[in-house]
Amino acid sequence: MNISRREFLSGGAAFAALPKFAALAELTSKGRSYSVPVLGDIHFDSPDPKFYHTDYTHSTSQKRYKAHLAEHVRNSEMWKERSPRLVRASGACLRKDAAFALQMGDLVQGDCGNAATHRRMLDDAFAFVKGAYGGNLPLVTVAGNHDIRGDIDGDGARETLEKWLPETMAKELGVPVAGTTFSFRQGPDVFIVVDFNEPRPNLATIKRLLEESKDARYTFIVSHGPVIPSGQTRWFLMGRKTRDVERKELRSLFARRNAICLCGHTHKLEFYDCEFPEGRISQFVFNSVWSKPEWGTTKVLGEGAAAYGRHRFGDAGNGLGAKSDAELLAEYTSAVRGYCFAEAAGHYRLEVSDAGVSVAFYGGDATTPSRTFQLK
C-alpha cells in the first residue's frame, strides 16, 4: 500500500516526538559482542517531488539542474512505498544486542534552495530513521555529498550540515563532537567517522584519532566515500589527484591498523578484502537506494579478485582521464584478495565479536538475510 504525503510527513513528526534516547556510553555493557543495524545511502525525500525542492535552482548549469530534477522524481517514486518499507524492515530485524544504528551518509537528497528547508529535511530524515528503531537506539550518521548539496552559488546547505551533524551526534553519543570528522568507542572498538567532502578530509585529524585509539581491538573507518576505489575512480576518500600523497599515506596508516572500512555513495553493494605490505584493509560499501524494484534481489556483476576494476560507472578519470584511472586501480589490484560488486539495495547488520566481524545483507525489505560477508 502506498503512503500518502500527509501520512509520510505526520509519521516523521511522530518519530520526532519519541522519548529521549540513552547515551551510547550507557549501552557499552553489551561488552565485546554486539550488532549494529546499518543503512546505506537513503536519499530521504517526499512522495511529492516538489515538497523540499520548491526553492531549488542551479544557477550555473541547466544540464545539472535538469539531472537533479530527475533525481527528485526518482526519489518521490522510491519514497512512496519502497524506501519506507526498507527502513522499517531494518527496524523490524533489530536484535537485543544492538549497540547503535549506523547510516552511511546521503541521509537526505539535499537540493532545498535555502538553509531552513535543508535543516527541516535533515531533521525529518533523522526522525524517520530513528523512529524505525524505536526511538531509543543511538543513531550515527556520516556526512555525504548530498547532505551538503544545494545551489552551487550557496544556499547554506554545507553550513547547515556542518552545524547540525556535530550537535546531533553529540546528543546521540553522549560525548562532545567538535566537527564532522570524529570518533567514538564501542566497547573495545573504535569507530572513526570521516567527512570525505572536499576540502574537509584532514590527514592530521585522522592521524590524531588513530593515535588516540591505538589500543582498540577493531578499527572501523566510517566514510561516505569509499577508501578503496573501484567503479567510480573520482568519488572516494582523498580521491583528487592533488591529494595522491596524502591518500597513499592514509592507505598505509589504515593498513597498519588492519582497518575495516564502512562506506556508501556508489549505490552498489561492494565487498573488498585487500592485503597491503603494511597490513589488511577490509571494505564494505552499503546501498539502501532502492531505485529499481528488481534491486531488492542481488545481481552480482563481478566476484573474485580478478573482477576488480572491470565494472566502471559514473564520473571517471580521477580528474585526468582513463589512463589515470588504470594507473590508480593498478595501485590496488595486486592487494585484492576478495571482491564482490553487485546491483542490490537493502538493509544490513554488522556483527562484531572476538571471533570476527561480518555483514549480513537483507535484500529490499526482507527480514531474513540472503548473504553474509566476512570482513575479519
Where do the PLM segments sit?
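Histidine-centered catalytic micro-motifs
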Residues: 222-227, 261-269
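Active-site glycine-centered loops adjacent to acidic/histidine catalytic or metal-binding residues
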Residues: 41, 105-106, 144-145, 224, ...
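C-terminal/domain-terminus segments
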Residues: 103-123, 276-281, 357-376
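Short acidic, glycine-rich surface-loop motifs adjacent to enzyme active sites
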Residues: 215-232
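Short, solvent-exposed loop/turn elements at domain surfaces
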Residues: 36, 44-50, 201-203, 230, ...
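N-terminal active-site segment of His-dependent metallophosphoesterases
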Residues: 24-116
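Extended active-site neighborhood of metal-dependent phosphoesterases/phosphodiesterases
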Residues: 27-28, 59-62, 112-218, 236-260, ...
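N-terminal export signals
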Residues: 2, 7-26
